[in-house]
Each structure stands twice: as structure tokens, then as C-alpha cells.
Design a protein with these regions (language model features):
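Flexible, glycine/charged-enriched surface loops at secondary-structure junctions
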Residues: 33-34, 121-151
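Conserved mixed alpha/beta catalytic, RNA-binding, or beta-rich assembly cores of soluble enzyme
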Residues: 1-3, 8, 12-22, 32-127, ...
Length: 165
């Protein structure tokens, strides 16, 4: 259903759906206060406080230097797709498209759909405009080479040095 909504094949929703399923089971079966499950760039989180989310974008000079701040706790899904990083099939060349939704399968599907639409950095503005029209998406970052676009309800975070390495 999520993949059909985003206009992609059903496999585009699998990693996000699995992350959310595992996260919800951990939370209920083990009475965890907080849960964060990461599955190949797709995150399901049920958190008490806010958190920073940097974006890994491969060889882009913006990789791990831009991201968002989730200001408060709750259930959230953050999924990323790329045409230049990792083994997954992509019809685009985005270094990273990160989508934030309440539903992980939907976030995963939309990340794939919008990553497929970015071939050059000139595509970013049109993709961001398209993302803004979708009420289910609460935030997004698109990265290609040295350019990025952001939209949604979360604040932009910038780091001088990559956080991960």
C-alpha cells in the first residue's frame, strides 16, 4: 500500500516496514523507554527527547554535515535512498534523499520515489516543491553533489566536521 501510494514497487517499502515492525515489538515486548532501529538507512524511532539526524550522502561534500533536528520525542520514521550509495537499484543519481513520516514503509517508499527523480543538482528544487505537496511527509532533505534542498517542520542542522567516521 505504501509503495503504491508513492508510485514505486513493493520492495521499496520493505526495509522501513521491517524497522518499524521490530521497533514496535521491542517497545511493547520489552517495555523499552526508547527504541531506535536502523535498517540500511531506514530508521524507526520511538524516543522521549529530540535528536539530531545527519544525512550520509556518500562522496558529496555535504555528507554527514547537514541534517535535521527532531525537537521532541514520539514515534518517527526517517528513511534515506540514494542513487550513488549502496547496492539498491535507483533510477536517479541523488546522493541522498531523506524523508520523514510517521509511517516507515511510507517514508521508505517516498525516499525511493524522490531519489529516482534527481539526476542533477538542478532537479532538487522541483523535487522539494513536489515533496511539499504531500501532507504525510513532515520533513525532507535532498542532496546532490554540493547542493541540497530542505523542507518540512524540522530545523536544519549543520556540522563543520562529519559526525560519523
Amino acid at each position: 500500500e505504501a509503495a503504491a501510494t508513492a508510485g514505486v514497487g513493493p520492495m521499496a517499502a520493505v526495509a522501513g516496514a521491517i524497522a518499524e515492525y521490530i521497533g514496535r515489538r521491542l517497545k511493547t515486548e520489552y517495555d523499552c523507554r526508547e527504541v531506535i532501529v536502523e535498517n540500511g538507512g531506514d530508521i524507526y524511532a520511538d524516543i522521549v527527547e529530540g535528536m539530531d539526524i545527519p544525512v550520509f550522502a556518500g562522496q558529496s561534500p555535504l555528507s554527514e554535515k547537514v541534517g535535521i533536528f527532531i525537537p521532541e520525542g514520539g514515534r518517527i520514521s526517517i528513511c534515506t535512498s540514494s542513487g550513488t550509495v549502496g547496492p539498491s537499484l535507483s533510477f536517479g543519481m541523488a546522493d541522498a534523499v531523506m524523508i520523514v513520516c510517521s509511517d516507515a514503509a511510507l517514508a521508505d517508499s517516498y525516499a525511493t520515489a524522490f531519489a529516482n527523480k534527481i539526476h542533477t543538482k538542478q532537479d532538487i528544487n522541483n523535487v522539494i516543491a513536489e515533496i511539499r505537496k504531500i501532507p504525510a511527509i513532515s520533513g525532507a532533505i535532498c542532496i546532490k553533489d554540493d547542493m541540497f534542498g530542505i523542507c518540512g517542520e524540522y530545523g536544519l542542522k549543520i556540522w563543520k566536521q562529519p559526525l560519523i567516521r
